Amino acid sequence: MAPVSLPPGFRFHPTDEELIIYYLKRKINGRQIELEIIPEVDLYKCEPWDLPEKSFLPSKDLEWYFFSPRDRKYPNGSRTNRATKAGYWKATGKDRKVNSQRRAVGMKKTLVYYRGRAPHGSRTDWVMHEYRLDERECETDTGLQDAYALCRVFKKTAPGPKIIEHYGVVHHHVEQPQWMTSSIDRSPTLDVSCDGRGDDFESSSFSFPTETPMDSMHGGFGMQMSAPHEDGKWMQFLSEDAFNATNPFLTNPVSANFSCLPSKVDVALECARLQHRLTLPPLEVEDFPQDVSLDTKIGILRSNPNEVDILQEFLSVATASQELINGSTSSYPEMWLGASTSSASYVNELSSLVEMGGVGTSNHHESARLQVEIADMEVFKDEKKRVENLRGVKLVNNDLGEIVVEGDESNPTEDIIAQYPIKVTADNSGEAGHRMTDPTDVGGIDTAPIFSQSQPDDFAAGFDDVNPNASFDLYEKVDVNHRLFVSRVAAAKTFFHRIEPSKKVSFHSNPAATAVSKATEKFHFPVTTKVSGRVSIFSKFKALIRDKFLMMRPSHSYQRLGSKETTVNELLQIVSLLLAPKQINGCPTEQELVKKKAKEVMKPGWGREGSNKLWLPLSKGKGISSMFLSGKWTFLTSALAISTPAECDH
C-alpha cells in the first residue's frame, strides 16, 4: 500500500487500548480494517533506522506503527527471536496489562535496541513498545501461534513534536493553559513507560506542565470552593459521550490497572464528568480516589466563604459535645438542611470523605484554624432504659455553627457500663455471704454514675449501696473426727536363684610319663640324709636299687608298670625301716626330720589303701615295731631285732 498523506491537523495517535482492541484484534482475527495505515513488516530483519521509510504515515512525529509476525527463537518454544543483523532488541522491565472495560485485553512490553551482540552490546536511543493480544480475545482456532504483534517504534532522544508549531500558535508562558485545555491531541513522547526505569523520558526534552497550569486546565477542580458561575466553563470541552462513558479509574480505582499514565484529554474528560455530577442530585455515593473526591454537600458551604472548613467539620464529627450532657439535644438534628435523609447515610458519607482526605480549601478564601473540643457522653433513658450514642461538636468560635449527628440505635447496649452493687446478706446457715444484685433493685439506672473520659477513676463507685450494718451470727461447734491411721509395710522381695550341678572336667595325659615322674619323685625323697648334709650309705643303696629296678622295667603295659612300681616301693620301705636308727641321747634323727616334713604336706587322703605316697609312722619316740601291727609283713619282724642304732652327729 502506498503511503497515505493526511490532511493538515490530522495525526495518528491511538491509545494502547485502541491499538489492541481495534487494530491488533482485527488483524489477528482476519477482520477488515477501514483504513490500512499500519504496514506489516518483519522488524527483526530490519534495523530501527530503516523503519521510518517503511511506514504508511510519514510525519514529523517520530514514531511509527507496524504489524510484525512473531518469530520463534526455538521451533517448540515460546520465546521470540529479537536479533537483527547489527544488534538486538532487549526487553526492559516487566510486561504491563492493557485493560479495557475492567478486563485485561493484552500485554505491553518495552524493548530497547542494542548494537552488537549480547551481552556486550551498546545501548541506543531506539525504543519499541510491543503489544500482544490476549488469548481470550483471539477468535481463530490456531490461537496466537501464527499471530502478529503490533509495535510502536520511536527514538526518545529526538525532541517531541511541539503542538504549538503544528497549530501555528505563538508560545507564551501565560497562554500555556489555553492551548493545553483546547488541544485534544497527545504528544508522541507523552506515553509514559511504566516499567520503572523511565526509558521514555531518560533524555527526552519533553517537559511536563506544572501543577498550577493543570489546576487552571481543570477549571479549579481539586475541591476549590469557587463561585457557581465557573461551573459553565466545564461544559465547553465536553460532549454527550463524556457523561455516558464509564471509566474504570472513576468507578473502581483499586481494581483498575493502568498500563501507563492517562493523557491530558483523559484527565480533562474525567474532571468534566465529575463536575457534571456535582450539579446533579446525589443519587449514590461511590468510592473515589484521593484526587477526585466528592462531597454531596459542597453546595451548602460554598455560598458563604466565611463558614467552617468542611475538612475540619468532618474530622470533628467523632464524639459528643459537652452541652449535650445538659440535655439540649433536641434542636441539633434540625440544623441539617437534608434532614429528610437518614442520619446513617450522612455518617457513611462523612466517614468515607474523611478517610480519603482529598478535600482541599480555596486559594482565595482560607479559614482560620479552629479549636475543637471533643468529648464523649452517654444518655440513659428512664422509660425504656435504652441508650443512644449521641455525638456532637462544639466549636470555640461562637460565630460558627454546630453540627450534630445521631448515631445508630440498632445496638443500644453497646457502650453500657454494667454495674452490679454488692450486698452483704446472711443465709440460713448463719454464715455471712455476698450476692450480686440487679441495678434496678437499688433505685433504677438513674442512680448509677455516668462515666466519661474526663472523670477520675473511682473504684468505690460500684459499692455505694453496701449495707454498713451487716449482721453476723456467731455459733460454736465442736467437731470430733475419729480417724484410723493405717500403715502398710512393704513385703520383702524374694530373689530366686538356680543351682546348677558341678561340671566334671577330665584331663587325659600319658600314663607312662606320669608313672615315671611319680616314681622318680618318691625315690628322690631324702630318707636317710643327715642334717649335716653328708650322703649316707642308705642313700647310695637307694640310688642303686632305683637304677637296677626302674631302668629294667618294660613300659609297654600300664598294668604291669603299676604292679612293679608297687613292689619297688614296698621293698624300699622295708629297707628304710631296717636301716632307720633310733633316737639316741635326744638327738633328732634323719627319720624324725622326714616325719616332720611329712606332717606339713600330709592330707586327709594319705595312708588309705591304694595310695602310692610314702607312709611313715607319725608317733614320736616309739619303736619301729608299731608299723607292723597290721600284719602285712609279719615274716620280717625278726629282722628288726638285729638293727643297729646309727651315730648321731652333732
From Swiss-Prot:
Primary location recorded for the protein, binned into one broad class: nucleus
TM stretches of this protein: none
Keyword annotations: Abscisic acid signaling pathway, DNA-binding, Jasmonic acid signaling pathway, Nucleus, Transcription, Transcription regulation
InterPro entries, A to Z: NAC-dom, NAC_dom_sf
Any one Pfam family match given in the protein's UniProt record, by short name: NAM
Domain NAC per the UniProt entry, residue ranges: 6-156
Residue ranges for the DNA-binding region feature of this UniProt entry: 105-162
Location in the cell: Nucleus
One GO CC term on file: nucleus
Gene Ontology molecular functions: DNA binding
GO biological process, one term: abscisic acid-activated signaling pathway
Tissue: Expressed in leaves, roots and flowers.
Gene inactivation effect: No visible phenotype under normal growth conditions, but mutant plants show a loss of susceptibility to rice dwarf virus (RDV). Plants carrying rim1 mutations show a phenotype of root growth inhibition, semi-dwarf phenotype with short roots, and sometimes twisted leaf tips. Mutant plants maintain green leaves at the age of senescence.
Further information: Under exposure to jasmonate (JA), NAC54 is degraded via the 26S proteasome-dependent pathway. Plants overexpressing NAC54 show early leaf yellowing under dark- and abscisic acid-induced senescence conditions.
Entry domain remark: The NAC domain includes a DNA binding domain and a dimerization domain.
Function text: Transcription factor that functions as a regulator of the jasmonate (JA) signaling pathway. May regulate the expression of genes encoding JA biosynthetic enzymes, such as lipoxygenase 7 (CM-LOX1), allene oxide synthase 2 (AOS2) and OPDA reductase 7 (OPR7). Involved in abscisic acid-induced leaf senescence. Activates the abscisic acid (ABA) signaling-associated gene ABI5 and the senescence-associated gene NYC1 by directly binding to the mitochondrial dysfunction motif (MDM) present in their promoters. Possesses transcriptional activator activity in yeast.
Protein name: NAC domain-containing protein 54
Organism: Oryza sativa subsp. japonica (Rice)
High-level lineage: Eukaryota, Viridiplantae, Streptophyta, Embryophyta, Tracheophyta
Originating gene: NAC54
